[in-house]
């Protein structure tokens, strides 16, 4: 049975009101909408489904899992290795800065909420900071992975609501429809070996590169 305190901690860590600035990023979605590649709920759903199956979010969350285990074991050398490894996979300045800014904000929050912790890094990627928070609050690794993926999907759907635009009810329908894919991605990530860490996300990379010079922008990525 799911522990109630564990559930509450997960809900807080994955909350859309977590003060990390997630709402200001679209991860290339703004460019894809401007170019007509994503124009309705079906094309947005297809983008999210494909990302969960083979995109960078899958790789990012797999690193989160490894950082989680390192923090539980207090293996900070290996934790830093995986955090640096994740930074190296960010293919544009926008995506790297997004990850660093959100990670820094979450670490600052964790210092306020858990002042007894004296082993938090000064800077880390968002996935790293999320893993540290999940470990500190004793959220199980599978729930941490699922919560991170759900938070990511919620944020991009919210961006889609404003960009396409879509109605709120349709956005909620999209999120419910993603549940099987979120569960499948979680199971796949849990079983992924180090030598199989990879992603197929050139579409995201090109969208992000184009976004850096886009004339009119609502989002920072």
Curated annotation (Swiss-Prot):
InterPro entries: UreF, UreF_sf. Its main location: cytoplasm. It comes from the Bacteria. The keyword Cytoplasm applies. GO terms for cellular component: cytoplasm. The keyword Kinase does not apply. Pfam families: UreF. It is found in: Cytoplasm. One of its GO terms (molecular function) is nickel cation binding. Keywords: Chaperone, Cytoplasm, Nickel insertion. Transmembrane segments: none annotated. UreD, UreF and UreG form a complex that acts as a GTP-hydrolysis-dependent molecular chaperone, activating the urease apoprotein by helping to assemble the nickel containing metallocenter of UreC. The UreE protein probably delivers the nickel. Required for maturation of urease via the functional incorporation of the urease nickel metallocenter. Belongs to the UreF family. This is Urease accessory protein UreF. The lineage of its organism: Bacteria, Bacillati, Cyanobacteriota, Cyanophyceae, Oscillatoriophycideae.
């Amino acid at each position: 049975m799911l522990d109630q305190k564990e559930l509450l901690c997960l809900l807080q860590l994955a909350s859309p009101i977590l003060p990390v600035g997630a709402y200001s990023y679209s991860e290339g979605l703004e460019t894809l909408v401007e170019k007509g590649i994503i124009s309705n709920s079906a094309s947005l759903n297809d983008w999210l489904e494909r990302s969960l199956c083979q995109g960078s979010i899958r790789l990012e969350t797999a690193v989160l899992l490894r950082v989680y285990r390192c923090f539980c074991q207090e293996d900070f050398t290996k934790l830093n290795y995986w955090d640096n490894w994740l930074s190296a996979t960010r293919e544009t300045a926008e995506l790297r800065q997004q990850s660093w800014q959100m990670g820094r904000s979450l670490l600052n929050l964790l210092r306020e909420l858990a002042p007894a912790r004296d082993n938090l890094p000064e800077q880390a990627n968002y996935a790293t900071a999320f893993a540290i928070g999940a470990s500190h609050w004793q959220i199980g690794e599978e729930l941490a992975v699922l919560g991170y993926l759900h938070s990511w999907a919620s944020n991009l759907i919210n961006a889609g609501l404003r960009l396409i635009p879509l109605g709120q009810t349709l956005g909620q329908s999209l999120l419910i429809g993603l549940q099987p894919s979120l569960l499948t991605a979680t199971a796949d990530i849990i079983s992924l070996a180090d030598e199989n860490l990879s992603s197929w996300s050139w579409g995201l990379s090109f969208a992000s590169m184009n976004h850096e010079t886009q004339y009119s922008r609502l989002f920072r990525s």
